Amino acid sequence: PNWNKTIGELKKKRVLFISEPVAGKTNISLPPDDGKKIQILEKDSISHDLNAHNGKDVALSYQLEAYDESYYKYAALSGAAYFTCHTLVRLDSDDYVSMCELTANYITRSEEVVGDSEVFSLASADSSTGAKFNENYSEERKNFLKTNVSDNTILIIDGPLIGNQLSSRTIRLVKDLKERNVATFFVTKNSDSMLLSNEIAPKKYHSDLDWASKNLPSGHRSSFIKYKDLNAGHTEIFCYLKTYAYASPLRISFYPTIYNENKDLVKEVMDMLYFLILDDGNQNNPQVRLIRIAELFAKDIIKIANPDRQVRMSGLIPTVNQSRFGRSL
């Protein structure tokens, strides 16, 4: 009944067709930092322009690597199989060099199924197979990156630094890599975070990404913002980077030590990420070029490995949703 009314209201609001912000709009009043989860680190302006030409020079001056993964889940009555392709891509002078690793996890709540297997994993009775998979995935990613990432590298990882069950493990990985002079930056495309928008204008924006889309001009980033998880004690610095007028900004996050020790490097990396998004050239789905390449490698390898066929040949009985849709819902 409310279909036409909702569509009509959206058209009136013109939610999808916002005007491009101008730099002057971004000099807004910021709240005091005392006792807050977040702290604005650059208070001269909430918006900072990015330089793609400088970003290209930075990309050619440092050793760059990017990580992404692709996984396939097969839900059976006796458990769930997860197949993951971990991929690391390095930018060489004239080509992309990839390193890939395929892993398989079979997770079940049945002790009888696990038996004396050295590769099956037992999930507790009150948890999901997904939670156990996340633990295994985190360990796999850590081992893969610690083994394959080069020393003295800028590493770009698809996904958040803080904000999921893997926060503690991810931070430990970042610290371990830093001992080898690896600076790690995380790029998130989808985020429901309201940390910044709730401080600046409560209830005015749907999310921080909504705020960034409406307040940052194209080719700009927000100020760097320090966030502390008051429950777990984890800390990160993040900003929002907007490349195109009518596409979602990206959230860039990194561990505070990197910023404290080399602010100039962090600012150069923001220019570099901006250049690599422009270099990728997808205005409908902005992404850092190296991450895009890693994603393509990972997805293609999963397709070639054809885990669905492998599992079906093993005789596992799929769930109804697995049979109907090729996945569990």
What name fits each language-model region?
Residues 1-57, 62, 116-329:
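Long, contiguous domain-sized segments
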Residues 62-72:
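Two-metal-ion RNase H-like nuclease active-site motif
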Residues 72-116:
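Acidic, metal-ligating active-site segments
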